[in-house]
Each structure stands twice: as C-alpha cells, then as structure tokens.
Amino acid sequence: MGRPRAMGGVPTGSPRDEIIAAAGRLFIERGYAQVTMSDIARAAGLQQSSLYYWFRKKELILQATFSVNRVPLEFINRIGARSGSPALKLYRLVRFDTLQLCNSPCDVNELERLAEGQPDLFAGFWEDRQRLHDWVVTLVAAAMEEGQFVDCDPDLVAVSLLSFDEGIQKRFRHQDQHRAGTASAFCHQPRGAEELAEFAAGTMMRALLRRPGDLARLQRQAADFVDDWRVT
C-alpha cells in the first residue's frame, strides 16, 4: 500500500533523508495538516531555502515517506516464495502490517485523503495499495481452495482486513489521550503495538478458518518467525 515506515532518529548524513526523518516525526506528533515547511526546516537543522532545494512542497516530503518505504510489499516479497500455507502467510502479513502501521510516523488515513485529492502526484501510493490488496485476495482464494478457509468473497475480505489494520492504527495513535485519569469521557486500557498486532491477526483468522481450532496451530507456527517483528 505504500505505507510509511517508522522513521529512526539517527542522522544518515544525507540532507534528504534527514528531512524525511524530521518531517515524519513532526507528522506523527502534530498531524500532517499542522506541520509547515518552516517547521520541517527547523527540525532538520536547515535554512528554509536549503529545504526547498530538496523538496518544493510538503506533499513531496510526505510522498517520499511512503514511496521509498513499501514495508508490507517488501515483507510480501520476503515471505512469498517461502514454504507455509496461505493461511499462515496471511496471518503473518496481518500481524506485520498492523505492527508497522502502529509504529509508522504518519496516519495512513491522512495519506489516503491527500492521495485522493492529488491522484497524479500520488499514483505510486495507489499502485502499492493495489498490489497489497491483490496479494491478500490471492492468499484468501488459495486458502479457500485448500479447504482452510470458509467460502467467502476474497475481495471483500481484503478490503475489510486492510481497513481493520488501519482502524487499529488510529486507536493506537490516540490512546494516550484516552488513558484512565485523563479528561476524556472515553477511557480504555492502553495496548502495545505487538499485542494489537497479534490480536488483529488472530481475529481475522478466527473469522476465516473453516476449523477454528486451527488457529492455535497457526499461532504456534507464526511464533517461529521472530524476524516478522523487525520493522526496518
């Protein structure tokens, strides 16, 4: 989907990369709409004129955060050729995708709103989204063919599954505002990204598996893939 990668705070030596990292931190702290080019320049330790040398406008910086960081698609390429049932691969993908969204510097819903308004500028965003959607469809169809999943509409499952991940990201990003003891009228227990990722994968598999008892086996198999937790 071209979803953004969590930005590290260590300078890379490249002004362009440092601008993207600084912007990513500001986007997650304040929200995309509230960040100005001046803010980004200051955070990156640059004069605004130097910032414009690398990026003419804020939208291009945001585009860079996902055009060079196609994290779920890289993950798909990594696990696609490996052994394992379609259901196991889908479990791992949902778990990984939820984790990387929770750790992302940008709100995926903000990205989508921006991309909707400027489809030409963000064509790559939608191309990535289509590839991710299609891969989920393929896995669901294969799991149905093998008798692992109940009969269902793979396209509808893909839309619902990816939307579920994105909804979890939204709640994760705002949970500090709703902890017990805050002024919010709505409070809930905060959850870690890994806990939410496991919950998302388990919930989706429980709804799809023809034999719900297979979930425990899938979870045991997925536990062997510790590399899934490294969002790089």
What are these regions (language model features)?
Residues A64, N77-N103, D107, V157-L161, ...:
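Hydrophobic alpha-helical connector segments
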Residues S67-E74:
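Short, basic, alpha-helical segments at the C-terminal edge of helix-turn-helix-like DNA-binding modules
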Residues T98-V137, E146-F149, D155-L156:
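Short secondary-structure transition hinges
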Residues M1, Q130-E145, K170-T232:
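C-terminal peripheral helix-coil segments that are non-catalytic and often amphipathic
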Residues G2-G9:
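Arg/Lys-rich, glycine/proline-spaced intrinsically disordered segments
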Residues E18, A22, L26-A64:
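Helix-turn-helix
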Residues E29-A33, S83, S104, E146-G147:
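Short coil/turn segments at alpha/beta junctions that flank glycine-rich nucleotide-binding fingerprints
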